[in-house]
Design a protein with these regions (language model features):
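Amphipathic, Lys/Arg-enriched alpha-helical "gate/interface" segment within cytosolic domains
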Residues: 1-139
Length: 139
């Protein structure tokens, strides 16, 4: 059952789903992302990761409009340490290669500096394959 987060206009900006078959959480970010929305969404994602004792996150930014640089510092300094402490080990981030969101994702990856296994993908199937390979190696 997905969790939908909506903005002040009633539009869904994030759909979070736990995928029990693959044992990962899937975040589908949609549209322009505000700082408050990113913080709320990232925290909601942490809850689902914790509830399912999940170490794998598939984060999809292909439908994001514009950059989200305004939240990168918070993600690196606040969210990531809590996610790692909660057991998150692998973060697959799917972006449209030429988008401003891709630039923000690269900034996030640099900020994390190896604290978390994070890779950027332009193809969601490649991201899923990477997470599945990580799961096989972990068992």
């Amino acid at each position: 059952m997905p969790t939908d987060l909506t903005n002040g206009f009633g539009k869904v900006y994030l759909r979070i789903t736990y995928d029990p078959a693959n044992h990962w959480v899937y975040n589908d970010w949609i549209g322009y992302q505000t700082y408050v929305g990113i913080v709320s969404g990232a925290d909601a994602c942490l809850l689902l990761l914790a509830e399912n004792k999940c170490a794998y996150l598939l984060n999809d930014n292909r439908q994001v409009i514009g950059p989200w640089d305004h939240a990168v510092e918070w993600i690196v300094a606040n969210w990531a340490p809590r996610a790692i402490a909660g057991g998150l080990t692998h973060f697959a981030n799917v972006v449209s290669p030429e988008s401003l969101a891709a630039s923000s994702a690269q900034s996030m990856a640099l900020g994390l500096d190896g604290q978390l296994q994070m890779r950027l993908f332009s193809d969601v199937d490649e991201a899923k394959q990477w997470l599945q390979e990580a799961q096989r190696r972990a068992h």
